[in-house]
């Protein structure tokens, strides 16, 4: 619920839904990436890329969820689940999106949700799907989705680089709203501006190696800023050695039957 707004969000390898809203959310979002690695790599079939509800117990409960989202790249890993799943009375305004990797890239459910798509209180425009759509109630349809003016495409093969980098020309310009950045293309991450670089990694790309501190040191050693170390049993700083601990170091004593401690002998130093 609520009206929280968000930009530049990456969700990777969630076993449940990558993005999920419910209970009246009416905020705004732009530049969202959901990426699910191949099932053979993960060992499981991820759930929906985006599960979108108003209220599961009372579909028409107010305030009705109706967020505005733009520039989405949603890449799934299983034929058995949905991409964008609109249901439980939700409304939505979704623009400039690419969805692939699911057997049903878009599904609509419940009378309230499909009626909103027909009467214009919900909008789906400039959306490219790698597969078709499914409309449970039969009120909305793939013909409505692809009709002139919506600029939507179904059953279209989409290729990306580095997992999710790439866009499709043509999109809705929402910059009249001060929240939205002008980005009249479909997708979240253009090749000319990969904003995910430098602060995100897909699961399994870089796993931190945690060094154990045990035994003894006879020469100087530095524990490096930003790293984590496991203290395992006795760790002796011998005569003539210096143990330097930089700011931002994390030292974890393992929870087991062994007593963990650092012993600084006479004639040695600790610099922290």
Task: Identify the meaning behind each predicted range.
Residues 1-272:
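Extracellular beta-rich repeat passengers
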């Amino acid at each position: 619920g609520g009206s929280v707004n968000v930009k530049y969000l990456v969700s990777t390898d969630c076993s449940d839904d990558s993005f999920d809203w419910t209970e009246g959310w009416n905020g705004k979002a732009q530049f969202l990436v959901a990426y699910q690695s191949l099932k053979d790599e993960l060992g499981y079939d991820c759930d929906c890329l985006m599960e979108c509800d108003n209220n599961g117990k009372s579909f028409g409960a107010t305030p009705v969820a109706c967020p505005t989202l733009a520039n989405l790249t949603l890449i799934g890993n299983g034929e058995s689940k949905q991409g964008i799943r609109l249901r439980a009375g939700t409304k939505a305004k979704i623009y400039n999106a690419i969805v692939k990797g699911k057997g049903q890239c878009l599904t609509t459910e419940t009378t309230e949700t499909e009626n909103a798509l027909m009467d214009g209180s919900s909008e789906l425009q400039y959306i490219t799907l790698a597969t078709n759509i499914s409309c449970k109630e039969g009120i909305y349809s793939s013909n409505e989705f692809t009709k002139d003016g919506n600029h939507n495409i179904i059953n279209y093969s989409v290729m990306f680089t580095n997992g999710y980098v790439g866009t499709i020309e043509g999109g809705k310009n929402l910059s009249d709203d001060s929240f939205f950045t002008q980005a009249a293309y479909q997708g979240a991450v253009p090749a000319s501006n990969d904003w995910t670089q430098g602060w995100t990694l897909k699961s399994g790309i870089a796993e931190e190696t945690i060094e154990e501190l045990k035994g003894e040191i006879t020469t100087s050693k530095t524990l490096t800023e930003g790293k984590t170390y496991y203290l395992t049993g006795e760790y002796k700083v011998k005569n003539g050695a210096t143990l330097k601990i930089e700011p931002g170091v994390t030292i974890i004593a393992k929870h087991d039957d062994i007593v963990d401690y650092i012993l600084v002998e006479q004639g040695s130093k600790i610099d922290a």
